[in-house]
């Protein structure tokens, strides 16, 4: 009887010892409340990718079209905006009067300047039409872009017909449309103005009531409308600026 009890105690001791050795080896250990476990999503802790040359961010199948510099995130460093253009041969066309035209679309790459290089913040490769689009009886609008007051401004000039511009600001991890301004002209005479502040949900319409009087100075009838909008338009989500619907309130 005593011998049987001895063998039983010996077996229990052997099993306990095996468990202790396994725990000390670091395998199959149950973490305590104070144990910090590694994240199962390494992307969340991955460091940002920096590149020394902004043009290194241009994807295959695109070339640099133009660019500008300025501070977009209020850190005092010169950020970079690149306009890129596709290179597909199938997008070239023969025009009756203008000859061979490149109709590849254009897009934007936005980079923040960091210590040690540039970081990709936003990219939209084909949101703009070609600079060689057909403008009908008049030439197509000319697109320019620049940085002012920590915002990115996209400016369309359309000669005697006026101009319009979109104003984007970096917020909520994207560039959101916070403003729009359009001047619709007849030569040197301004006919209508649309001025929108999407941050305050305010739209101001101005109509020149002296538009048909060449001798009179411009005099505008002003109407201000407040509107509702849940979310702001993000630059990364715009597929085509030519088809962009701002969903503005009607000026009845």
Regions found by a protein language model. Give the residues of each.
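Repeat-based blade/solenoid architectures
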Residues: 58-66, 125-140, 162
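Sec-dependent signal peptide recognition
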Residues: 2-9, 19-23
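Acidic/hydrophobic-patterned starts of short beta strands in beta-sheet-rich repeat architectures
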Residues: 72-84, 146-156
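Surface-exposed loop and turn segments in beta-propeller and other repeat-based domains
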Residues: 52-56, 125-135, 187-202
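Beta-propeller blade repeat segments, especially FG-GAP/WD-type strand-to-loop junctions
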Residues: 91-124, 168-170
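Acidic, small-residue rich beta-repeat scaffolds with periodic aromatic anchors
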Residues: 19-28, 142-252
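Short, low-complexity, disordered segments immediately C-terminal to signal peptides
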Residues: 19-44
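C-terminal motif of bacterial Sec signal peptides marking the signal peptidase cleavage site
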Residues: 15-17
């Amino acid at each position: 009887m005593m011998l049987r009890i001895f063998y039983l105690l010996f077996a229990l001791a052997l099993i306990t010892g095996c468990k202790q050795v396994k725990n000390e080896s670091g395998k199959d250990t149950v973490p305590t409340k104070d144990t910090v476990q590694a994240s199962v999503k390494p992307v969340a802790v991955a460091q940002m990718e920096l590149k020394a040359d902004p043009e290194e961010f241009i994807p295959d199948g695109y070339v640099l079209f133009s660019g500008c510099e300025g501070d977009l995130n209020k850190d005092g460093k010169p950020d970079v905006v690149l306009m890129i253009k596709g290179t597909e041969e199938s997008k070239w066309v023969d025009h009756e009067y203008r000859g061979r035209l490149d109709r590849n679309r254009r897009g934007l790459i936005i980079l923040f300047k960091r210590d040690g290089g540039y970081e990709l913040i936003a990219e939209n490769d084909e949101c703009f039409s070609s600079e060689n689009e057909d403008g009908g009886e008049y030439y197509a609008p000319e697109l320019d872009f620049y940085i002012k007051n920590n915002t990115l401004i996209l400016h369309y000039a359309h000669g005697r017909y006026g101009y319009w511009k979109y104003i984007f600001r970096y917020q909520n991890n994207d560039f959101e449309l916070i403003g729009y301004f359009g001047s619709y002209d007849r030569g040197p005479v301004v006919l209508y103005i649309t001025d929108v502040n999407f941050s305050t949900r305010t739209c101001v319409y101005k109509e020149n009531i002296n538009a048909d009087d060449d001798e009179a100075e411009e005099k505008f009838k002003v109407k201000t409308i407040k509107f509702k909008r849940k979310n702001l338009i993000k630059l990364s989500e715009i597929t085509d600026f030519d088809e962009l619907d701002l969903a503005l309130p009607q000026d009845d």
